[in-house]
Amino acid sequence: MSEYRIRVTTVDQKVGIFQVPRTKTVLELKELIAVTFEAPADRLKLIHAGRVLRNETPLEEILHDATDLVTFHLVIAVFNSTSTTLPSATSSSVPQSRTSELSSTNSIPTPRITSLNPEELSRRERAQRLLQTYNSFHGSGLGGLFPNIHRELESHGFSLPTHEQSSPVAESLDNSVSSALSPHLETLRRRNLSIHHQHIQAHEMAQESLETRNPGNISSSSAPLASDQSPTVSSNHIHASGNLALGSNSGLNPRSPNSFSSPLDNPALHTVDSTNVNGSLSPLSNSSSINQVHQNETHGSTISVPNPNLSQMGPSHSSSVPSNLSPNPAQNENPSTTSIPSINNQPFPSGLSASNSNFASSSFIPQSVPQLLPIYYQTIFYNGNYYLQQLPSASPPTMFRDHSFAPLVSPSIVSPYGVLENEETGECAFLFSPNASQPHFQPRAPTFGIPRNVRSLFTLPFFHTIRNIERHFRLFIRLALFCVLTTYNVSLSQTILLTSIMSVVFLLQTGALAPFINDNPLIQSGMRHIRNLQDEYRRRRNRTAQRVVEIPNETQTEDEQDGTNTPDNRADAEERELTRSQRIYRTVVRTIVAFALSFVPRA
């Protein structure tokens, strides 16, 4: 096949199919399709397989032996990259009025990027667009928004027009602050917030460029530190998380005013507040003795920032809690608060949580931290009542390999009964007198007995059996009688039968067979039948005697007049025919049956 079948498509969905010989080049293909798309060949750009085709490339190098229909994408450029000149940019005549400036600005046609690759635009085309943008903003009085546009034009080989260079607005391009003071720009900024934001961004860019060019001329204001190297705490330095932010030099990093603040709460910098039930922490005092040295890489200055001294931390208590409940044993007048027994060899932790940016390096972490909370428990006043609260340092913390400690657990609040018991160790603390006059503890020695869960595992079935014995006392009296009968019975078969019945009834009443009985439908149907027999027997036993009233009737037959055919009369007749011994025997049999049926438990 000596020709290629090429389909050319444009952005506006215009399609053309052409038969092109294999020996043609890309430029000859452009000349062939230029008539169809009504554009000169030098403004046409063909794209195939994501590449812009060069004019001198033969089609055989691109399509090789393709026999099917091949698709090329066509882009029509607005300006000719080889012959485009800058209109009205080289004009030497200076306009005399604002109308002539706007007319010269509008003489530049609005460019429209039709190429799929922005890099294809030449430097001259990009410079044209920059100049058009500057002219449009300068005509409206907003030329100060682009202070660096003349540098961009110079990088592309262009310069501002003569009338623009001589204008007072062009002379103030480097000073964006002075241009912001113009009343026309101030009015536009009030009306349009987006222009105001653009002006602020342009001012920041100008400041950054000045700092980049002249880093030595920029003077950074630093906050002086106190003579005692104590941090200055203000309302701006205290965050919502409760951390204490240390004083810092603003010259280190102008974009981060506080280099030592942390959004995470550090329990090491606080003491437990006695009036806070949720265990939140109060801020630390300003005393400090450890200085951290931070080196500024840019200026080489050394700033000593104090670190809080953990040994001088003092407790904070509310006025509603008496003073004798202070965690400090030196201030505690009542010896019972510090004599709470403990079975741990190391009751207090030797370290605390240091997973905070305030302790940035492990070299600043002391190996042995003073004890913050020397007692296990404290009283808190909440909703008019006193409660016991376990302190966070009741158990030694876990130390990891990176010399950091596990976070402290939140203090637990007990019930208003005022008793706190450790189930693992058996240690107890009681609020002996929960009133404002005598709030103190009564400790109890730990008991090293069987754990509670082990005790309940073995004693629960026996307690369950005792409760069943109390609930079914009459039934177990009958079982005791069964035991007597089986003991003095000479027949082995009767003894085995009675013993098995007694065992089954015992298991039924204790509930040991409940899982098997409740899930077996056959046993459930048998139990329902036995309960029905019990109900029928009790109904017959508890019914009242019926009175038979004879009403004489002349139309009755002889048998009816005699009354021999009625059921009650027949039962009475049979009862009269029995002897006294027979009646006693029938009563005993019925009693035994009722006694046997009473063993079946009722629902």
UniProtKB/Swiss-Prot annotation:
GO cellular component: cytosol; endoplasmic reticulum; endoplasmic reticulum membrane
Biased composition, class Low complexity, residue ranges: 219-231, 280-289, 315-329
Ranges of Basic and acidic residues composition bias in the record: 569-578
Chain segments carrying region Disordered: 85-121, 159-178, 206-348, 544-578
UniProt domain Ubiquitin-like: residue ranges: 4-79
Residue(s) carrying Phosphothreonine: T566
Protein name as it appears in the record: Uncharacterized ubiquitin-like protein C1E8.02
